[in-house]
């Protein structure tokens, strides 16, 4: 899931091109620009968070696409229960990511307001698949973090930079990470 076109940076576009040049199949899903702008404003007014709907779309897109394309396994990066302390996302073990649907990002405030803001049809991209859809598709999500002894934001940034990722030049005080 990417940012809406007006929020995409040259660094982000170059990093995406780099991943493709490494031989990865890449499928890009981006929210519609006008709907995204409308939802960002509504999200800011209601939650004080301009990025809430972008995060909802990010978390929801991956399993929706996997179910649609009959991909049985998603390898997810960070374990939100460990990395950011969202215990509702904790699974049966450190690798189990099947409780992402319980993340505060996806549950806090619901999504009815999104339907009201842009309509049911346009809001489907913001709906995280329910457990029944997961079970029917036999979809499993696993966190990658526990497979690496040195999983951290710093180590991941170093590894990414050494393998072709272009990092943002701004200071952490500006970017937040």
Give short role names for the model-derived ranges.
Residues 2-177:
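Nucleotide-activated chemistry modules centered on ATP-dependent adenylation/adenylyltransferase
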């Amino acid at each position: 899931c990417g940012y809406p076109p007006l929020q995409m940076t040259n660094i982000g576009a170059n990093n995406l091109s780099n991943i493709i040049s490494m031989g990865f199949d890449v499928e890009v899903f981006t929210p519609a620009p006008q709907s995204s702008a409308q939802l960002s404003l509504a999200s800011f007014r209601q939650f004080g968070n301009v990025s809430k709907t972008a995060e909802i779309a990010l978390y929801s897109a991956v399993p929706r696409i996997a179910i649609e394309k009959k991909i049985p396994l998603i390898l997810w990066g960070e374990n939100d229960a460990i990395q950011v302390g969202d215990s509702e996302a904790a699974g049966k073990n450190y690798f189990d990511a099947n409780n992402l649907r319980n993340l505060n990002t996806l549950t806090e405030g619901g999504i009815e307001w999104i339907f009201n803001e842009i309509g049911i049809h346009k809001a489907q991209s913001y709906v995280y698949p329910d457990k029944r859809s997961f079970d029917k598709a036999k979809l499993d999500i696993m966190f990658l973090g526990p497979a690496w002894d040195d999983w951290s934001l710093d180590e991941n940034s170093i590894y990414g930079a050494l393998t072709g990722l272009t990092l943002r030049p701004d200071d952490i005080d500006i970017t937040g990470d």
